[in-house]
Amino acid sequence: MGPEKFARAKPHINIGTIGHVDHGKTTFTAAITATLANDGESFAKAYSDIDGAPEERARGITINTAHVEYQTRDRHYAHVDCPGHADYVKNMITGAAQMDGAILVVSAADGPMPQTREHILLAKQVGVPHIVVFLNKQDQVDDDELLELVELEVRELLSTYDFPGDDIPICPGSRLQAIEAISSNPTLKRGDNPWVDKIYALMDAVDAYIPTPERDVEKTFLMAIEDVFSITGRGTVATGRIERGVIKVVDNVEIVGIGDTKTTTITGIEMFQKTLEEGFAGDNVGILLRGVTRENIERGMVLAKPGTITPHTNFESEVYVLTKEEGGRHTPFFTGYSPIFYVITTDVTGSIDQFTADDGSIVEMVMPGDRIKMTAELIYPVAIEEGMRFVIREGGRTIGAGVVSKIVK
């Protein structure tokens, strides 16, 4: 018997956790799923389930590393955990680009860390529209005034990066206390335990504060490929979030970017081990492709309706260059500068050929804090189009964020 069908009964929201690695993001996700499971809305996920990818792959077309699903009374959530290792920022950029909102996890015992600042900044750059804060480790803070102080610090930090710091819900709690309470009594319901209730309060805030986005279902289908793997006897699977449009089994799609463009047919679509007849904008899906080998396709390519997007190397863009205080460069850069461009799920080196100031004059040098028009050339072709956002990085730091304004070639 194949996987069950996915029931589209509630609005689907993509959410994620961001924050300092040691502030307990992953066990925090386990706390949410375990809590909501007792509301009859979700299945509990153990910590090992959330951080483990290879075992999941044996079960069908599954989604990258740590996509977990859960439901509240009003919504269906896909939750992406940005992994906390060397690839963190790369995954944060691709993961955050898929988020309709994020839960920022901050330790109430430690307050905001240097990474917290970078993660809020990245969330702003890649366009995470809404943030709710979970102040973890409340059980380690005896002093209410200290808790208020940390809350104030977090609000100020969010306001610094143009999030509405005064309005954002901040929910204190302890993911460890919640998990321990549920482990010792798996039947705990809302109202039975103060620590578990704090997780409910957080998800109530997420339900209320993060709006249901309008999905681009009218536009032509596009999905950036986040991961690729093979299933013996079934073929090759590409996973990612559908950026726009609708896709059905047996539709033809093009694989665009990096190498030559290829056409293939979709033979299956799944979300969380459940089959879909069609995938909609906003869905995190695995798409099974006919006649495609693992060598033909890689992260950074896109699947698209045939003839709707083409690979390019040269484009004009409008870019904001971060200041030193925002975590950017301390010094100017010049034409010929070759940073890394993060476009949807791709990271590719490019050289900057020309800078143009707002008045149309050509400039040789760009300072941190400048807003500038620039022409860039990537070392290999990537599926890009006007209006696409990107982030520019070098040496482990974000130095700018921009939008493609014109395709040159």
From Swiss-Prot:
Domain of life: Eukaryota
Occurrences of domain tr-type G (ranges): 10-214
G4 as annotated region, ranges: 136-139
Renumbered residue ranges of the record's region G5: 174-176
Single GO molecular function: GTPase activity
EC number of the protein: 3.6.5.3
Family of the protein in this entry: Belongs to the TRAFAC class translation factor GTPase superfamily. Classic translation factor GTPase family. EF-Tu/EF-1A subfamily.
Protein name as annotated: Elongation factor Tu, chloroplastic
Organism for this UniProt entry: Stephanocyclus meneghinianus (Diatom)
Lineage summary: Eukaryota, Sar, Stramenopiles, Ochrophyta, Bacillariophyta
